């Protein structure tokens, strides 16, 4: 543990906690502060000026990252007939209907994402207690309840990430791996911020993006220059 603490301290010392970093510098720094032997995920913590207790201020969405997430996504799809065939041809790993529901009820969870056609939501809905806590319940707002399975499967395979504001008004969203080139991290992050800014609720008052911090899985937080972000997404 002393060795771990020493490595974290060394990484933290590279970051000026009082400074707000420009994007290019932040992306280089986030790579320098990744000290683990595994390829750490890079996350953004975005503090928004919204009150999620009000339904019209719940910010949520999804974005296909230009450079993906650096991992293979195992995808399950609830569909029947021609739609099941469409999902299989698009590259879905598991396709089923009532049979897949029974497997999930029996403990099968060998997938990362779940998509369903609207007509299958009656079956999927009965799995709410299993899927809900794991963040796997399909939702039309993020494109996981759809008739366009070919597109949905390809987007998920390409590295589509979903986000939803939490009770404290914070959005946590991953956007790559520490091994990524800084320019790829920057492109992925910028794609997320573009969607975040466009998702601003009309009823939100005052400053919308109040704080943005980047970090690797086990690394220190790096605060971003908000003026630069606002100018880029004006």
Curated annotation (Swiss-Prot):
Checking InterPro entries in the record gives: Ribosom_uL1_bac-type, Ribosomal_uL1, Ribosomal_uL1-like, Ribosomal_uL1/biogenesis, Ribosomal_uL1_3-a/b-sand, Ribosomal_uL1_CS
A molecular function (GO) held by this record is: rRNA binding
PROSITE patterns xrefs: RIBOSOMAL_L1
Pfam families associated with the record: Ribosomal_L1
- Note the SUPFAM superfamilies from the entry: Ribosomal protein L1 (SSF56808)
> Is Transmembrane a UniProt keyword of this protein?
no
What processes in GO biological process is this protein linked to?
A: regulation of translation; translation
Does the keyword field hold tRNA-binding? Answer: yes
Q: Which UniProt keywords apply?
A: Repressor, Ribonucleoprotein, Ribosomal protein, RNA-binding, rRNA-binding, Translation regulation, tRNA-binding
Which cysteine residues pair off into disulfide bonds? none
NCBIfam families in the cross-refs: rplA_bact
Give the quaternary structure. Part of the 50S ribosomal subunit.
Primary role: Binds directly to 23S rRNA. The L1 stalk is quite mobile in the ribosome, and is involved in E site tRNA release. Protein L1 is also a translational repressor protein, it controls the translation of the L11 operon by binding to its mRNA.
Q: Which family does it belong to?
A: Belongs to the universal ribosomal protein uL1 family.
Record-given protein name? Large ribosomal subunit protein uL1
Gene name, Swiss-Prot/TrEMBL: rplA
């Amino acid at each position: 543990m002393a060795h771990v603490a020493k490595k974290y301290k060394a990484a933290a010392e590279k970051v000026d906690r009082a400074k707000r970093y420009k994007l290019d510098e932040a992306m280089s720094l986030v790579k320098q502060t990744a000290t683990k032997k595994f390829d750490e995920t890079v996350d953004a913590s975005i503090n928004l000026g919204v009150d999620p207790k009000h339904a019209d201020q719940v910010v949520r969405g999804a974005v296909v990252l230009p450079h993906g997430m650096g991992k293979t996504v195992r995808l399950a799809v609830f569909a029947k007939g021609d739609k099941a065939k469409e999902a299989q041809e698009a590259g879905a790993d598991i396709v089923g209907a009532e049979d897949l529901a029974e497997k999930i009820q029996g403990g099968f969870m060998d997938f990362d994402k779940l998509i369903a056609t609207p007509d299958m939501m009656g079956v999927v809905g009965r799995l709410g207690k299993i899927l809900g806590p794991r963040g796997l319940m399909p939702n039309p707002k993020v494109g996981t309840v759809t008739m366009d399975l070919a597109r949905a499967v390809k987007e998920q395979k390409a590295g589509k990430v979903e986000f939803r504001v939490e009770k404290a008004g914070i959005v946590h969203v991953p956007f790559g791996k520490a091994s990524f080139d800084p320019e790829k991290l920057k492109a992925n992050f910028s794609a997320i911020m573009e969607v975040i800014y466009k998702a601003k609720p009309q009823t939100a008052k005052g400053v919308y993006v109040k704080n943005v911090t980047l970090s690797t899985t086990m690394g220190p937080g790096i605060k971003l220059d908000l003026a630069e972000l606002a100018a880029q997404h004006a």
